[in-house]
């Protein structure tokens, strides 16, 4: 998943003259450069379900946070409101992953479910690309909880019937 998201974010930022990034609850994507403005907020200190930031964001990234939101549809509509046209929203969430209450764990989406979710938040369904990664061995290895990746034991081959994580890129 990280490899694919890295590729997606690199592809987006390479096509934009100026990049104004908002990252919600993370700092992995700190994109740097002369033409980059980077803002980071953390949930629950900044409640994306209730608040919007002023700004002209053309890239908003929410990696592994929306599953923790009590009102993800409100948050999705707030993201849509904060995003410039054209702009990109990159979101990832777990699917077949142990419950992890930080502070709560509420929601999971399949690839199709993620597309419907983003459509209900205001994005055009024809401008949403979803994908997923996982496999049966990965799901079994995480029982009873997350494990560190071991190249010798764990396959990276994708099986769409066993998604561990789901992500989307929505273009406004």
PLM regions: where:
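Conserved SAM-binding loop
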Residues: 10-100, 111-115, 168-171
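N-terminal accessory regions of S-adenosyl-L-methionine
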Residues: 1-39, 129, 137-153, 161-169
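S-adenosyl-L-methionine-dependent methyltransferase catalytic module, highlighting the catalytic core
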Residues: 70-80, 84-172
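Hydrophobic (often cysteine-bearing) scaffold residues that line and stabilize catalytic clefts
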Residues: 1, 5, 57, 110
